[in-house]
Amino acid sequence: MKKKAVILLSGGPDSTTVLEIVSKTDYEIYALSFNYHRRNSLEVQKIQGLIKDYNVKQHRVINIDLQSFIGSALTDDNIDVPKFKNTDQLPSDIPVTYVPARNTIFLSYALGVVEVIGARDIFIGVHTNDYTNYPDCRPEYIKSFEAMANLATRVGVNGEKITIHAPLINMTKEQIIKKGLELGVDYSKTISCYDPTEDGLSCGQCLSCIARLDAFKKNNVQDPIKYV
């Protein structure tokens, strides 16, 4: 019987690269996505087309309301998504696009799914990005959450170890895109933008777009998605 794995899938290049990596293993894949604000709703739409390319056993989309977490440009309609011209302008501290406890919330849901379906492995596409300082993307965070997961679940207490896999954790965005291209990821079906237009065009100026464009440029490859 195949081992089961839960993959947190956002529709962006990082989680899609992880999906590609896991698809080349013997895991039975259970994808988990979240619809938490209008600014990420396009991501969820993209995922529907994306997973058709993969042998995903089940895809769950969980609707959660993070708008009470004010102070983030991704959940607070009163805060504009910052725009930049190049990587030199990107902030060196934790950006306003940080969503309080987002990965902790997402991983907690994944932990529940793991127990329900009998899986022991969770995959997430976090990495120590060259241009952001999200606290819930660090190696020590993943290690700590894994320790908590094994203390707070029945399977963990019973000695059946739950493992949080972050295969991109020490990679730069440039390295992730390079890896994905080598594996054959179709990045035209992904989206990174924090502030896309209603018809699905990426803004090309938010932190995520700038980092993505820079990564493709460094790989001497044209980004296949459309920008404003």
Swiss-Prot record:
ATP binds at residues 9-19. Pfam families: QueC. InterPro entries: QueC, Rossmann-like_a/b/a_fold. Keywords: ATP-binding, Ligase, Metal-binding, Nucleotide-binding, Queuosine biosynthesis, Zinc. Binds 1 zinc ion per subunit. GO terms for molecular function: ATP binding; ligase activity, forming carbon-nitrogen bonds; zinc ion binding. Pathway: Purine metabolism; 7-cyano-7-deazaguanine biosynthesis. Its cofactor is Zn(2+). Its EC number is 6.3.4.20. Zn(2+) binds at residues 193, 203, 206, 209. It is an enzyme of class 6 (ligase). One of its GO terms (biological process) is queuosine biosynthetic process. It catalyses: 7-carboxy-7-deazaguanine + NH4(+) + ATP = 7-cyano-7-deazaguanine + ADP + phosphate + H2O + H(+). Catalyzes the ATP-dependent conversion of 7-carboxy-7-deazaguanine (CDG) to 7-cyano-7-deazaguanine (preQ(0)). HAMAP family: QueC. Belongs to the QueC family. This is 7-cyano-7-deazaguanine synthase. It comes from Rickettsia peacockii (strain Rustic). The gene is queC.
